[in-house]
Amino acid sequence: MDNFTVGVVVFPGSNCDRDVSWALEGCLDIRTKYLWHESSDLSDVDAIVLPGGFSYGDYLRCGAIARFSPLINALDEFVKSGKRVLGICNGFQILTESGFLPGALVANKNLNFICDDVELDIVSTKGGWFNNGDEKQTIKLPIAHGEGRYHCDSDTLKKLVDNELIALRYKNNPNGSSFDIAGITNEKGNVLGLMPHPERACDETIGGTDGLFTLKSLILK
């Protein structure tokens, strides 16, 4: 995978792009390239990460303005080609606003910003996410969000369950998410959105390495 490159998207207001790049390059030796949101040329990257932060200041709704950027418009063909896309926190919000993933991320039930480490059950490894030859069924990752409560209607929830599209569930739901959902994939399995931050759990010196389960999955084909 010497030539494999992960594009890390940068929006006005992104603040986790460097964290993602550090985790991929420093912990996994995976090459990264920053992609400014106005770019529509994705030809030289093999996978894409939409990082956390506050794209466009989260005006209107989280991810509501970012969905109109040229890069997100170009993402449609990228996804259709089968290449992998990971949306973390604000990136997950952008993926739902853009229609790449169903449902929505809304204000936490307690209306407060939550910053904590949470335990998560790996519910599905659809598309190869979290499936790196390890039998671990529970991981611990940090969360940091004010609008991270996953919400969908009953028909969508049934579809998520029936098609094994729920990747992660909270053990102790911190934000009121429907069905304790912390992360989901698309039907093809090459797009994953999750509210927890795997890039903040890639080295023991910063609290753990469970985030590697997610980031390693980017290099699968």
Curated annotation (Swiss-Prot):
GO terms in the biological process aspect are: 'de novo' IMP biosynthetic process
Q: Which domain of life is it from?
A: Bacteria
InterPro entries given in the database record: Class_I_gatase-like, PRibForGlyAmidine_synth_PurQ
Residues in domain Glutamine amidotransferase type-1? 6-221
The principal location of this protein is cytoplasm
**Annotated EC:** 6.3.5.3, 3.5.1.2
GO MF annotation terms: ATP binding; glutaminase activity; phosphoribosylformylglycinamidine synthase activity
Q: According to its UniProt record, where is this protein located?
A: Cytoplasm
GO CC annotation: cytoplasm
- The active site annotation covers C89 (nucleophile), H197, E199
What's in the keyword line of the UniProt record? Answer: ATP-binding, Cytoplasm, Glutamine amidotransferase, Hydrolase, Ligase, Nucleotide-binding, Purine biosynthesis
Reaction(s) catalysed by this chain, per the record, are: N(2)-formyl-N(1)-(5-phospho-beta-D-ribosyl)glycinamide + L-glutamine + ATP + H2O = 2-formamido-N(1)-(5-O-phospho-beta-D-ribosyl)acetamidine + L-glutamate + ADP + phosphate + H(+); L-glutamine + H2O = L-glutamate + NH4(+)
Q: In which pathway does it act?
A: Purine metabolism; IMP biosynthesis via de novo pathway; 5-amino-1-(5-phospho-D-ribosyl)imidazole from N(2)-formyl-N(1)-(5-phospho-D-ribosyl)glycinamide: step 1/2
Query: NCBIfam families, per this entry?
Result: FGAM_synth_I, PRK03619.1
HAMAP family (UniProt xref)? PurQ
Q: How is the quaternary structure described?
A: Part of the FGAM synthase complex composed of 1 PurL, 1 PurQ and 2 PurS subunits.
Listed PANTHER family: PHOSPHORIBOSYLFORMYLGLYCINAMIDINE SYNTHASE SUBUNIT PURQ (PTHR47552:SF1)
Primary role:
Part of the phosphoribosylformylglycinamidine synthase complex involved in the purines biosynthetic pathway. Catalyzes the ATP-dependent conversion of formylglycinamide ribonucleotide (FGAR) and glutamine to yield formylglycinamidine ribonucleotide (FGAM) and glutamate. The FGAM synthase complex is composed of three subunits. PurQ produces an ammonia molecule by converting glutamine to glutamate. PurL transfers the ammonia molecule to FGAR to form FGAM in an ATP-dependent manner.
Q: What name is this protein filed under?
A: Phosphoribosylformylglycinamidine synthase subunit PurQ
